Amino acid sequence: MFPMVTKFMNYGQQTVRAARYIGQGFIITLSHANRLPVTIQYPYEKLITSERFRGRIHFEFDKCIACEVCVRVCPIDLPVVDWKLETDIRKKRLLNYSIDFGICIFCGNCVEYCPTNCLSMTEEYELSTYDRHELNYNQIALGRLPMSIIDDYTIRTILNLPEIKT
């Protein structure tokens, strides 16, 4: 008879433990129920990206000295730098610079290590196209500054700030 009593006690303890776990999950569910939805209506509403957002790379052709540091620090050797050595002035002259954003992982190493700061990250993140070859940007396409979301009057901007609980 004694083993039968311990089985009932274990069953009772397991029942109480299961009810407690279910109650904890229910409390978490109820705490999430009173939050505001996070969804936005994308084409008409856009989040303002943070200052350190890593979007499309902006390139300034005049500042580049063709040192190829960006190629060496890139984990996938992505930037294509074509240059010609000018023998009369003993300097490299940049001929072509291109980045394929279909392959780029937006790590920011090229921007970080560029000695002349000719590369910078913009807040542009809409790079989708129907043809993947359109994602190969040359120095002309990289030199264009993106249109700011804030300046577009057709788009309602939403600040992406964390809520402060009081």
Curated annotation (Swiss-Prot):
Names of the cofactor(s): [4Fe-4S] cluster
A Pfam family the protein falls into: Fer4
Positions with a binding annotation for [4Fe-4S] cluster 2: 74, 104, 107, 110
Major subcellular site: plastid
Cell compartment(s), UniProt: Plastid, Chloroplast thylakoid membrane
Enzyme Commission code(s) on record: 7.1.1.-
InterPro entries: 4Fe4S_Fe-S-bd (IPR017896), 4Fe4S_Fe_S_CS (IPR017900), NADH_quinone_OxRdtase_chainI (IPR010226), NDHI (IPR004497)
Gene Ontology molecular functions: 4 iron, 4 sulfur cluster binding; iron ion binding; NADH dehydrogenase (ubiquinone) activity; quinone binding
Positions annotated to bind [4Fe-4S] cluster 1: 64, 67, 70, 114
Keywords linked to the UniProt accession: 4Fe-4S, Chloroplast, Iron, Iron-sulfur, Membrane, Metal-binding, NAD, NADP, Plastid, Plastoquinone, Quinone, Repeat, Thylakoid, Translocase
Topological category with respect to the lipid bilayer: Peripheral membrane protein
Record has Glycoprotein as a keyword: no
Residue ranges of domain 4Fe-4S ferredoxin-type in the record: 55-84, 95-124
GO biological process, one term: photosynthesis, light reaction
Quaternary assembly: NDH is composed of at least 16 different subunits, 5 of which are encoded in the nucleus.
Function noted in UniProt: NDH shuttles electrons from NAD(P)H:plastoquinone, via FMN and iron-sulfur (Fe-S) centers, to quinones in the photosynthetic chain and possibly in a chloroplast respiratory chain. The immediate electron acceptor for the enzyme in this species is believed to be plastoquinone. Couples the redox reaction to proton translocation, and thus conserves the redox energy in a proton gradient.
Family: Belongs to the complex I 23 kDa subunit family.
Name of the featured protein: NAD(P)H-quinone oxidoreductase subunit I, chloroplastic
